[in-house]
Regions:
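A general structural detector for well-ordered alpha-helical segments in enzyme core domains, enriched
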Residues: 67-70, 99-103, 128, 159-167, ...
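Active-site beta-loop-alpha junctions enriched in small/polar residues
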Residues: 86-88, 119-121, 142-146, 182-186, ...
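Surface-exposed cleft-lining segments at the edges of enzyme active sites
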Residues: 86-92, 148-157, 175-178
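Auxiliary Fe-S-binding modules of radical SAM enzymes
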Residues: 2-6, 191-282
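Structural preference for beta-strand elements that scaffold enzyme active sites
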Residues: 80-82, 113-115, 136-140, 176-180, ...
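Conserved Radical SAM active-site core
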Residues: 1-138, 146-148
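Surface-exposed amphipathic alpha-helices with a cationic face
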Residues: 108, 129-133, 164-174, 244-251
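Conserved strand-turn element in the central/C-terminal portion of the radical SAM core barrel
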Residues: 156, 160, 166-189
Length: 282
């Protein structure tokens, strides 16, 4: 690992189409400009790689003292802040720098709720369980495939089986935890495994296809016929068909970007029409 660079733009509120549809648009990234998970299809990577601003071997690290000062200025009624917007806040370098660990403690101190989004089983390590306040903590662990060997071909995160064990551990301990199936690629998911995960909640986000995505997944893209902006999506009826096969959870929500489908899931399907994340707010 080379010289550690400071990641300065650690907090932002997302606007545009995504921000308008997301109930929790404020993101706090403890690491940036690279992620050691280096998922080949990563949205952040696609934006930064061609500008030579993506360094998966040596991500930049946010200054925890600056983060603490920022958190202290937040109003007491701040909605949940998402930890891990552009990069994973529990990527392996967290074990070295512990910026996420200290950020969680700072958020707890100010009573600010937080939504952790990660592909890492580290979030379920005992040292993090000890500091996470169940009244403030919401956790989404992302799974893209149920096949450990397949996952190795496009991401360097914890194996799917490890993530599932982390989900089940956090569920058993009473945390507000969700399996985030994102992106949902039906060809990559064994429904018998998925539907037997011991977790109450699942959040599904279907694959959005552009020229970057088409490089990485060996699937039939001919079904992705609905175009919006620079992405192609599955038709709503096809999405409904795939969703109907997910049966092992008490609550299922869909995070959607395509406008017609967004309105359908919001008004006719999601348990909480105002919050597709379906967080358990105390």
């Amino acid at each position: 690992m080379g010289e550690v660079k400071e990641f300065k733009s650690f907090m932002k509120t997302v606007g545009g189409n995504e921000g308008n549809k997301c109930h929790y648009p404020t993101r706090l990234d403890t690491y940036g400009c690279g992620c050691t998970h280096d998922c080949k299809y990563c949205y952040a990577k696609s934006l930064l790689d061609f500008r030579n601003m993506w360094n998966p071997l040596n991500p930049s690290v946010a200054d925890i003292e600056k983060i603490k000062r920022k958190i202290k200025k937040l109003p007491s009624d701040t909605p949940a802040i998402r930890l891990g917007g552009m990069t994973d806040c529990f990527q392996p370098i967290e074990k070295i720098h512990r910026v996420t660990y200290e950020t969680i403690k700072a958020l707890n101190k100010q009573k600010i709720p937080y939504l952790i989004v990660t592909k890492s089983a580290i979030v379920a390590d005992d040292e993090y369980i000890e500091i996470m306040d169940k009244k403030l903590t919401h956790i989404q662990i992302t799974v893209t495939t149920t096949d450990d060997e397949r996952s190795k071909t496009y991401e360097k995160a914890s194996l799917p089986s490890e993530r599932i064990r982390a989900i089940e551990k956090l569920q058993a301990l009473g945390f507000d935890v969700t399996l985030r199936l994102s992106p949902y690629i039906p060809e990559y998911v064994d429904l018998d495994i998925l539907n037997n995960v011991k977790c109450d909640k699942i959040l599904v986000e279907f694959l959005r296809v552009n020229s970057w995505i088409e490089k990485w997944f060996d699937i039939d893209y001919s079904e992705y016929t609905v175009k919006q902006n620079s992405y192609k999506h599955l038709p709503l009826e096809k999405k409904k068909e795939y969703i109907s096969k997910i049966t092992g959870f008490k609550e299922i929500s869909v995070c959607e970007d395509e406008t017609e489908a967004y309105e359908y899931w919001k008004n006719n399907f999601n348990p909480n029409k105002d919050d597709c994340c379906n967080l358990r707010i105390n």
